[in-house]
């Protein structure tokens, strides 16, 4: 399965296998960025798979320009001298996620980097993930309107209002086609960390009201 330039078929298969193996039925799915796209595709194909869907700064349309930027960064391996350097690197590349406390940056650093054989640190993700993305010159806008229109479960959209991935115009158009709850985070871009107490409390409150 391919959504424009993003290949998500393996993620869909893995998720369905995971649900079946652990006998998970009608969970609430909270997906950030690509995780949100996977959730939307699942909800559109399997009408009763989720009790509710929470989309963290992702929607029915993504402009190509920020995807080119993300793809270019993800393909690079940056080596960092120590954890302090790693923390400063994360503060630079994740400046828009809205983290306020140093303790949260420490936590993010702990789980975002791994040590290398040379004693340095690098980002803890599989660089092969970029193989599913097109070259910058061929990158297209990602259009998920047909997927979005088929979703039937309850939806909360979390919008980092400084985001280039989920723009105000996209949110407006999404509202024209479907009813959903919207949580706007003014100080964040792509994508809100959901680590600040006010963010956590909002999501918890929404879940309690919808249970």
Model-derived regions: residue spans:
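Conserved hydrolase catalytic core segment
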Residues: 22-66
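Conserved catalytic-core motifs of eukaryotic protein kinase domains, centered on the activation segment
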Residues: 1-5, 64-67, 168, 195
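Conserved loop-alpha-helix segment in the C-terminal half of the alpha/beta-hydrolase fold
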Residues: 150-188
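Alpha/beta-hydrolase
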Residues: 88-153
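Active-site loop/oxyanion-hole signature of alpha/beta-hydrolase fold enzymes
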Residues: 1-30, 201-205
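A catalytic-pocket lid/entrance helix-loop region that shapes and gates access to the active site
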Residues: 58-85
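Catalytic histidine-centered segment of alpha/beta-hydrolase-like enzymes
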Residues: 188-198
């Amino acid at each position: 399965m391919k959504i424009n330039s993003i290949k998500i078929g393996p993620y869909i298969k893995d998720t369905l296998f995971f649900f079946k193996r652990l006998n998970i039925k009608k969970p609430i799915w909270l997906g950030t960025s690509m995780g949100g796209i996977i959730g939307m595709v699942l909800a559109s194909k399997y009408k009763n798979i989720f009790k509710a869907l929470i989309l963290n700064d992702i929607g029915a349309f993504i402009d190509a320009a920020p995807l080119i930027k993300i793809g270019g960064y993800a393909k690079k391996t940056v080596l960092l001298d120590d954890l302090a350097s790693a923390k400063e690197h994360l503060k630079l590349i994740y400046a828009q996620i809205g983290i306020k406390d140093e303790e949260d940056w420490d936590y993010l650093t702990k789980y975002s980097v791994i040590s290398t054989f040379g004693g340095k640190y690098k980002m803890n993700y599989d660089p092969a993930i970029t193989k599913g993305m097109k070259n910058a010159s061929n990158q297209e806008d990602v259009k998920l309107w047909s997927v979005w229109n088929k979703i039937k479960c309850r939806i909360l959209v979390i919008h980092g209002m400084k985001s280039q991935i989920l723009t105000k115009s996209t949110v407006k158009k999404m509202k024209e086609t479907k009813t959903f709850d919207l949580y706007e985070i003014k100080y964040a871009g792509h994508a809100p960390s959901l680590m600040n107490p006010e963010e956590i409390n909002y999501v918890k409150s929404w879940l309690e009201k919808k249970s």
